[in-house]
């Protein structure tokens, strides 16, 4: 929740300045893990403060237990916040009390709020609300008695300080007292519905009423894309927010199509700001753990986010491990890798027998033999190899397009996304890492030794960690435990066995792990923007029967079509057959 700074806003609706408003935020349910953003749009108070004079904020709950939770998660702002318990759910009398004190009211429930999207807002002139209609046989008999066909519940209610509002609330209280029953929430909704119909539908619908052309109220704040859109609209209204020039020519940034970060943008007016990400809308952020905040927001590959590469002297060993555990190694693939890998690179082929020899009598042995899925076996083989030797592991069906040198610099551990357009699931066709034993009385090549500290400074124990970041041995230990649970869980399907592993790796800070975009290692050329084609490092030719190719029209015009099948045919073709076609 952003702290309100009134210097950032200009009062634009002077006709409301003579009125004082109270915000009523009614929280009916919340868990211990919830923060205010889960049920109330975070920029509501900032946005409304630029429109009206807010005298106070009332945060209502139904019981003392909820009240104790909300003490820690209530929004932080300079406007007084009163935390109240309304065990009787007597919201109508609460509104009457505020009206008697000459205060206008805005009532919010879960997943609602207000955002400055338009320069003019007409939704504060009269009684207005977001409504939800309920058609239920359980209430049909009661509704028929009053000539009603539906029950209206109010998600957001604007009650300006005028005679119509007082009359409306008084009538609601009158009908609510006449109704018999123990369900207070139903009685309140029914009294609101009856009063609205008897007064000629005086409450304007914020969603459909043509008399409210500019509506800044929002509801159902559950979609991350919509929340981020509202946040950017809020930032654009503030004069000191300026859009950043996109770093698409800066080699220190990597572009991720479809993705964005679910965080509040940095204020670019701050002098000498150093940012770690910038989306294609020009909003920047400075997050130490960018990957845990990423989500699929955009609908096309031309919109996304730029993330800064790691800036350090760490270097992964230049050793490529090619995994062939499902079938015999293909000489065509092997020759391609041997051609592109030059000194000091090492190249090792691992088949099923060599993997079994490596993991014999280790903690990986039981997991590998119990794994039922090929993807599980491949991941176990990759991690067991990296733990001992470090370097880069790839599965069988990868062919190189350029050198892998750039992947070894600045990374402790790296993987890639599977397909950004469908989410932030990770791909394990390629994994790179420092040796997993690093820190357990092994030489750490990334620690500088001062002359007077002697040889002991070359060594670091597992407990040595000035920050709370994971070190490589801890990452491998955690991956072992997660894989062990995944292998033993018979309910895991082909697609979700790595869900917990994905979650763990995404939660690590950017100093411990880097996640590359999918097009680096598994590009869909038909959908990829042309300017990114030179970033592709390798192509994966493995086929999955349940994955259908996505085809969209691109701006690239060629007399030929590049497909994975065509590349595979060229690789499988015997060079002698090519000579036969030459006359």
From Swiss-Prot:
Q: Which organism is it from?
A: Acanthamoeba polyphaga mimivirus (APMV)
List, alphabetically, the SUPFAM superfamilies matched. Nucleotide-diphospho-sugar transferases
Q: Name one GO biological process term.
A: mannosyl-inositol phosphorylceramide biosynthetic process
GO cellular component term, pick one: membrane
Q: Which InterPro entries match?
A: Glycosyltransferase_domain, Nucleotide-diphossugar_trans
UniProt superkingdom: Viruses
Report the protein name in the record: Uncharacterized protein L263
Citing just one GO molecular function, the answer is:
mannosyltransferase activity
